[in-house]
Structures are given as structure tokens and as C-alpha cells.
Amino acid sequence: MKIYVDADACPVKDVIIYEATNAEIPVTLVTSFSHYSNAKQPTGVETIYVDSGADAADYRIMQLAKKEDLIVTQDYGLASLALAKGCIVLHHKGYKYTNENIEQLLQTRYLSAMVRKSGKRTKGPKPFTAEDKEKFRVLFKSIIAL
């Protein structure tokens, strides 16, 4: 298993790096050049920089990921593609994407886009909380322990 992180706006990178390096599982952070950093990463953690295009990180992750790899993303489109490839996919708020829930998530995203296109406003996501982070940590540790 390898871990790929859609890292541009991922609030749990620290959890992923800490838990994965302790378990000696390689991590690849995929992020745009606009988030460039000179920060030294622990052994086993690689950062790949991509152009700032809308889906550049998603495309790169899909090029790299193989069946049974673990992907962390908040992007439903990437999650859908990764599930079809046989990957395990987690959201940073601590839930697992599945073939059973991805259709509803994509449909909700589509309907919200149509509402916004018509000029109306939609509610954004709830703020990320410490409880969300702990929920993610518990789920992540259970997945990498398998």
C-alpha cells in the first residue's frame, strides 16, 4: 500500500505523515506549485508539485495510484475515479468513500452547482473541527493497520 494525498487544502497532512511514517508506509503529497515549500519531510514522504490547473493534482494522483492504494481527498470526482480503480479513498473529515455513497455525493455536488449557476447561493461546508481530525485519525489508523 502507498498513500497519496490531494494536499492543496488537506487539513490532516500532519496526521497522515505521523501515522504513516510510524507504520513505515510511503506517503506522496501531490500539490500545486502555488503551495511550494522548502520544509524537510520525514523519510518515506515525497512531495510532487504540479501546475496550478483545476484538476492537475487529481490527474497526477490517478496516474500514480494502483489498486488497494490509499487516497485522501475532499474531491468527489477524484474519489469516484479512485474507487473505480480499486483504491481505498478517505475524506479528511473522517469518512470513507464507497461505491454506495459516491453517487449521492456526486449528485449533491451537481445539484448545488446548478443552484449556483441559476444565481442562488448554497451553503458551504461546515468548518473543520478537532473532532473531525480525531475521527479521521481513528479511521486512518484502522485502514493502515490492515
Curated annotation (Swiss-Prot):
Transmembrane segments: none annotated. Pfam families: DUF188 (PF02639). InterPro entries: UPF0178. NCBIfam families: PRK00124.1. HAMAP family: UPF0178. Belongs to the UPF0178 family. This is UPF0178 protein BcerKBAB4_2842.
